C-alpha cells in the first residue's frame, strides 16, 4: 500500500511505530489455496540410516507428515501478526529423492485472508522434525529451499513460482 502522497509505502501492520493485526473484518471470505516446498539435504550417513531403517527415533517421513499438518493449523500461534483462519484442507507430502527429502504442502481455506503462511509453516515444521529425528546420524543435515510455489484467491490474485531444478 502507498500513502496518499505516493512518497513511501504505508506499513499495514504498524501504526505509530507499534505492531498491530490488520483488520480483515470487512473482507468477504473467499476460497484460497497455497502450495509450498522445503528440502532436507542429507549427508550420505543420514541417507544410509534412513534407507536401512536404522533411524534412532523411528520413521522421520511419517512423523514429518503429521508435524506438517499440525504446523499448518498452529501458524497463528507461531507467526505473531498472522490471523487465525480455518484450515479447511491440508496435505503434506514427504518424499525421499536423490537430492534429499522433498516436502510439499497444499493448504486450503475459505477466509478473508490467505493461507501462504500456513503452507510455509507446514513445510518448515515438517523439515525441522526430519532434522530432529535424523540429527543423531549427522549434524550436517540442511533444511533448504523453503518457498511458496503457488497461491490462488484473494485481492492480490494468483501466483506461480518459477520452476527451478531440485536441490543439489
From Swiss-Prot:
User: What EC class does the entry list?
Assistant: lyase
Query: SUPFAM superfamilies, alphabetically?
Result: Molybdenum cofactor biosynthesis protein C, MoaC
Record-linked InterPro entries:
MoaC, MoaC_bact/euk, MoaC_sf, MoCo_biosynth_MoaA/MoaC, Mopterin_CF_biosynth-C_dom
Q: Where does substrate bind?
A: 81-83, 117-118
Family, similarity comment:
Belongs to the MoaC family.
| Molecular function as annotated in GO | cyclic pyranopterin monophosphate synthase activity
Keywords, ordered alphabetically: Lyase, Molybdenum cofactor biosynthesis
Q: What is this protein called?
A: Cyclic pyranopterin monophosphate synthase
> Which reaction is this enzyme known to catalyze?
(8S)-3',8-cyclo-7,8-dihydroguanosine 5'-triphosphate = cyclic pyranopterin phosphate + diphosphate
Hey, which pathway is this one from? Cofactor biosynthesis; molybdopterin biosynthesis
The record, for Pfam families, names: MoaC
Tell me yes or no: is Lyase among this UniProt entry's keywords: yes
Q: How does it assemble?
A: Homohexamer; trimer of dimers.
Q: What does this protein do?
A: Catalyzes the conversion of (8S)-3',8-cyclo-7,8-dihydroguanosine 5'-triphosphate to cyclic pyranopterin monophosphate (cPMP).
Q: Which organism is it from?
A: Deinococcus radiodurans (strain ATCC 13939 / DSM 20539 / JCM 16871 / CCUG 27074 / LMG 4051 / NBRC 15346 / NCIMB 9279 / VKM B-1422 / R1)
> What is one process in the GO biological process aspect for this record?
Mo-molybdopterin cofactor biosynthetic process
Name the domain of life this protein comes from. Bacteria
Q: Which residues form the active site?
A: 132
What EC identifiers does the entry list? Answer: 4.6.1.17
Which NCBIfam families does this one have?
A: moaC, PRK09364.1
Amino acid at each position: 500500500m502507498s500513502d496518499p502522497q505516493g512518497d513511501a509505502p504505508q506499513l499495514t501492520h504498524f501504526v505509530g511505530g507499534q505492531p498491530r493485526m490488520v483488520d480483515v473484518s470487512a473482507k468477504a471470505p473467499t476460497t484460497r489455496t497455497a502450495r509450498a516446498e522445503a528440502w532436507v539435504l542429507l549427508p550420505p550417513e543420514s541417507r544410509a540410516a534412513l534407507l536401512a531403517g536404522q533411524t534412532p527415533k523411528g520413521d522421520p517421513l511419517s512423523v514429518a507428515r503429521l508435524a506438517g499438518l499440525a504446523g499448518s493449523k498452529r501458524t497463528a500461534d507461531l507467526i505473531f501478526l498472522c490471523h487465525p483462519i480455518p484450515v479447511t484442507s491440508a496435505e503434506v507430502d514427504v518424499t525421499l529423492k536423490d537430492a534429499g527429502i522433498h516436502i510439499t504442502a497444499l493448504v486450503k481455506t475459505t477466509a478473508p485472508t490467505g493461507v501462504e503462511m500456513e503452507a510455509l509453516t507446514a513445510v518448515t515444521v515438517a523439515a525441522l522434525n526430519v532434522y530432529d529425528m535424523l540429527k543423531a546420524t549427522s549434524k550436517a543435515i540442511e533444511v533448504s529451499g523453503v518457498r511458496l510455489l503457488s497461491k490462488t484467491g484473494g485481492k492480490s490474485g494468483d501466483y506461480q513460482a518459477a520452476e527451478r531444478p531440485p536441490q543439489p
